[in-house]
Swiss-Prot record:
Similarity annotation: Belongs to the glutamyl-tRNA reductase family.
Sample GO molecular function, one term: glutamyl-tRNA reductase activity
The protein's name: Glutamyl-tRNA reductase
Subunit and interaction comment: Homodimer.
Keyword Cell membrane tagged: no
Organism from which the protein derives: Bacillus mycoides (strain KBAB4) (Bacillus weihenstephanensis)
EC number: 1.2.1.70
Note: During catalysis, the active site Cys acts as a nucleophile attacking the alpha-carbonyl group of tRNA-bound glutamate with the formation of a thioester intermediate between enzyme and glutamate, and the concomitant release of tRNA(Glu). The thioester intermediate is finally reduced by direct hydride transfer from NADPH, to form the product GSA.
Record note on domains: Possesses an unusual extended V-shaped dimeric structure with each monomer consisting of three distinct domains arranged along a curved 'spinal' alpha-helix. The N-terminal catalytic domain specifically recognizes the glutamate moiety of the substrate. The second domain is the NADPH-binding domain, and the third C-terminal domain is responsible for dimerization.
Amino acid sequence: MHILVVSVNYRTAPVEFREKLTFQAAELEQAMNTLQNQKSVLENVIVSTCNRTEIYAVVDQLHTGRYYIKKFLADWFQLEIEEVAPYLSIFEQDGAIDHLFRVTCGLDSMVVGETQILGQIKDSFLEAQQVKATGTIFNELFKQVVTLAKRAHSETTIGESAMSVSYAAVELGKKIFGDLTDCHVLILGAGKMGELALQNLYGSGARKVTVMNRTLTKAEVMAEKYMGHAKPLSELQCALLEADILISSTGASEYVITKEMMTKVERMRSGRPLFMVDIAVPRDIDPAIDELEGSFLYDIDDLQGVVEANRAERLKEAEKIQFMIEEEMVLFKTWLSTLGVVPLISALRDKALAIQSDTMESLERKIPNLSDREKKVISKHTKSIINQLLKDPILVAKELAVEEGAGEKLALFAKIFDLEVEEAGNTEEVEHKRAWTPSVPSL
C-alpha cells in the first residue's frame, strides 16, 4: 500500500484556476464516496479551502492511483485531464506524509503558522471517517498529525506573529487608510472567513461595520458581537454607496458584485474611492471591476505581499516544528511497518488457541466428571500459560518487523512456528481490511 497526495494550491495555480477545482462543503461527502469507488483507491480524505484542494489517498499502486485521482478531479469538475495536470503537485510515501504534517501545522500556508488549516484538516478527516472513506492507515496518521499540530502551536511561538488571510486583508486596509475608526466597513458573508476579518477589523479600531449575508439572521448574530449592523443582501447596492472598505467571502458560485452593478454605484459615490478585498474562492467580485477608476480591488493572491512582512520571524519557529515533524514521521513509519506482522501474530494466536481448545476437549473426554466450574478454571489457566508462552515470540516478531530485511526474517519466524501466512512481513501486500481497524480516540 502507498500514501499519495494530489494537490492544487496557491503555489501551483492562480486563483482563477483554483476556483474551478473547489469542492463545496455540501458535496464533500458525495465526492469522497465517489473517489472511494475509484480503482486503486483504498482510503481517502479530501481537503478543499480557499488556498488549496488536496486529495490524500491510500492506494494499492502508485501509478494507477495517480491516474485515477487525476481522472476523478477532471471528471468531477468537468475538465480534461490535460487541463488539470499542469497545476497539480504530487507527493508520494514519505513526501506525502511530510506534506500532510506541514500543511496541518500551517507550514505550507500562505500565512506560515496560521491555525485555521488545522481545523479544516480535522473537519475533513472526521467527515471522511463518517462516510467510511478512511481505514487503518489514515485513522492512525491523521490522529498523529492533528495531535502534533496542536503541540507545535503550543510549544512554539509561531502563532504569535502568524496571520490569517483575513487578518492580512485587514492589514492591507490599514496601510491604505491608516486609522480605521472613521471608515465604514462592509462585510459580505457571515462564515468563518468573514467573522475572522470582522474580528481583526474590530481589534484595529473599526466601529462602523455592516454585515450582509443571504441569511439575515446569521448576519445579525455576527454583527451583534461587534456592535455592527446587519442588512439583507437585497440592499447590497445601497450598502456599497456608504462603504469605504469592503471585504467579501460569501462562498457563492457566481459573482455577487458585477462590473455593471459597480459602475452604477460609482456614479453615485461622487468620486469617493472604495477599497475592495475579495478573499472568497470562487471569487465574489468580478475582477473587471478593477478597471473602474474609483474601485481598488484585491483578491486572495494579492495578499501575498502583506503576508511576507512577518514571514522571516515565523520561519525560525517553522524550523523547530519541522524537526518535530521528522520525529513524528519516524514514529508513524515504525507503526506502519508493524502492520505486516499483524496477520502473523493473529495466526500464531489462532494456532495456540486451537491447541488449547483441542486439549480441553481431550481432557473432558478423559475426565468426564469435571464440573463446569472446574472446566472454567482449567480453561482459564491453560490460556494463561499460552499467553505467557506467546509474550516473548510476539515481542520478537514486532521487533523484526521494523528491522532491515523484515520480510525474510518474518518468513523464517513463520516457518519456525509452522504458520501459513501470505506475504508475512510485507506491509505493502497486507490485505487492507477495515474489519480490524482500531477505534480512534476523539480529536
